[in-house]
């Protein structure tokens, strides 16, 4: 469906590496395969040879040579200029748990917010799940007016593994509005902004 589109952007601060500025485009699949070989505390070192045009990924005794993609064939994501009416910041573990609970009942989750609370709700054919956070339980809450929007858990649930280890996740949305999720990890070395289009009644 056209309303299921999603976008991601990640920024890694230059304090995490030593290099001369260059632009390299890689297939995420290949990086994921390499990362999967390591333990949580392992480091991957990347070295790019401009003469050969080959990037070497080193993990312990493993060296993998990767041929980068042609940058001219890559279209960078266009971040939408959206005016979000509501913003909520909460602990990553709490948000992760609410998504996992929601998935036990259905495929679509409703986020609703007003000046006093943020609610995660799923209504299934026989069961329902509601997770409510009062403003005092949230790290921050900004809301001009009550808003509600529905999103697919197909895209949200895989992120719950990431959210569980985060100190905070910032959500921004409005009535039947795209969802923006912003978070940082590794002590702020990397910042991610993820956009997910809403599911509206005409989609169902």
Where do the model's predicted regions map?
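Single conserved hydrophobic/aromatic residue that forms the stacking wall/gate
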Residues: 1-12
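A short, sequence-level motif marking secondary-structure junctions
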Residues: 10-14, 67-74, 134-138, 197-201
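Short, surface-exposed beta-strand-loop junctions and turns on beta-sheet-rich folds
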Residues: 13, 62-64, 125-129, 186-190
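DNA replication sliding-clamp ring fold and its partner-interaction surfaces
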Residues: 13-49, 79-114, 119, 135-176, ...
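Internal, conserved structured core segments that host functional sites
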Residues: 50-83
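Beta-strand residues in well-ordered beta-sheet regions across diverse protein folds
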Residues: 56-58, 112, 121-123, 172, ...
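Short helix-loop boundary/capping segments
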Residues: 117, 124-126, 133
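Short terminal or interdomain "cap/linker" segment that borders an active site or interface and mediates
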Residues: 118-120, 178-204
């Amino acid at each position: 469906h056209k309303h299921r589109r999603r976008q991601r952007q990640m920024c890694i601060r230059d304090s995490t590496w030593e290099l001369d500025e260059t632009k390299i485009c890689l297939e995420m699949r290949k990086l994921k395969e390499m990362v999967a070989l390591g333990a949580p505390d392992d480091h991957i070192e990347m070295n790019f040879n401009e003469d050969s045009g080959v990037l070497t990924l080193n993990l312990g005794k493993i060296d993998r040579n990767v041929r980068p993609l042609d940058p001219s064939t890559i279209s960078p994501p266009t971040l939408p200029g959206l005016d979000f009416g509501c913003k909520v910041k909460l602990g990553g573990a709490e948000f992760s748990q609410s998504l996992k609970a929601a998935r036990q009942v259905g495929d679509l989750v409703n986020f609703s917010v007003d000046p006093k609370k943020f609610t995660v709700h799923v209504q299934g054919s026989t069961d329902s799940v509601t997770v409510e956070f009062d403003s005092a339980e949230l790290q921050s809450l900004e809301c001009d007016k009550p808003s509600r929007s529905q999103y697919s858990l197909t895209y949200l649930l895989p992120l719950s593994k990431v959210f569980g280890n985060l100190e905070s996740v910032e959500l921004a949305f409005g009535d039947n509005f795209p969802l923006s999720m912003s978070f940082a990890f590794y002590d702020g070395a990397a910042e991610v902004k993820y956009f997910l289009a809403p599911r509206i009644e005409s989609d169902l």
